[in-house]
Amino acid sequence: MKLTCVLIVAVLFLTACQLIAADDSRDLKRFSRRKMRDGMLNTKNTKRQCLPPLSLCTMDDDECCDDCILFLCLVTS
């Protein structure tokens, strides 16, 4: 019985540690992979082909120059 209680407490403690140490995905929009790459490639000679607004995209699609929300490429101003 004591061993079971110790195991339950240990699992709860480790779960709490994982939740505390997990990355916060709310800041993903501020530091997205696309924006970081654009900052590194920001030269006058670099041209990107962008998808038009309201075209289908995926969440990791780099052809959507603006935001990809619900599989649609949206223009943010």
UniProtKB/Swiss-Prot annotation:
> Which terms are listed as keywords in the entry?
Cleavage on pair of basic residues, Disulfide bond, Knottin, Neurotoxin, Pyrrolidone carboxylic acid, Secreted, Signal, Toxin
Q: Where in the cell is it found?
A: Secreted
**Prosequence residues removed at maturation:** 23-46
Recorded GO cellular component terms are: extracellular region
Q: Which InterPro entries match?
A: Conotoxin
Annotated tissue distribution: Expressed by the venom duct.
Query: Principal place where this protein is found?
Result: secreted
Disulfide partners: C50-C65, C57-C68, C64-C73
State the superkingdom: Eukaryota
Keyword Hydrolase assigned to the entry: answer is no
Q: Where does the secretion signal sit in this chain? A: 1-22
Residues with the Pyrrolidone carboxylic acid modification: Q49
Q: Which GO terms describe its molecular function?
A: ion channel inhibitor activity; toxin activity
Q: What is known of its domains?
A: The presence of a 'disulfide through disulfide knot' structurally defines this protein as a knottin.
| UniProt similarity note | Belongs to the conotoxin O1 superfamily.
- Record-given protein name: Conotoxin ArMKLT2-022
Q: Which organism is it from?
A: Conus arenatus
